[in-house]
């Protein structure tokens, strides 16, 4: 569902406007899953294909084109998709967005070390890599 926005002070945009990556990842503490933001239709599509759950999207209103249209078709119809001008999005990020799209996703639980080791044939431990 497309929702036009004209300023960044709307509470629905908190995840995009007020929280950094660390704060997003810890948002549901003590539940360690949290959230992350994917940028660009290609990265968003990869996250969707990896079964991450989208929460909302922020999209440049001028980038609703073939690539974004294909992406929008992958998203649930009920997903809030906030649309804004390039100038407004640039004021948020400080730079021109690649293909004008950001998408908020829920993080998935990661495999435990025990599970990874149980499934692995060979394991490498790297330390102090520069």
What residue spans do the PLM features occupy?
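Structural motif
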Residues: 35, 55-57, 80-82, 100-103, ...
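Short, well-ordered coil/turn elements that cap or connect secondary structure elements
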Residues: 52, 75-78, 119
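RNA substrate-binding interface of SAM-dependent RNA methyltransferases
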Residues: 49, 109-130
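Short, aromatic/basic amphipathic alpha-helical patches
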Residues: 66-78
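A generic local structural motif
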Residues: 44-45, 68-69, 89-90, 111
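Extended, non-globular alpha-helical segments
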Residues: 2-23, 30, 80, 85-116
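Boundary-proximal intrinsically disordered activation/regulatory segments immediately upstream
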Residues: 1-68
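Flexible, acidic active-site loops/lids enriched in D/E/S/T/G that coordinate Mg2+ and/or position polar
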Residues: 59, 72, 105
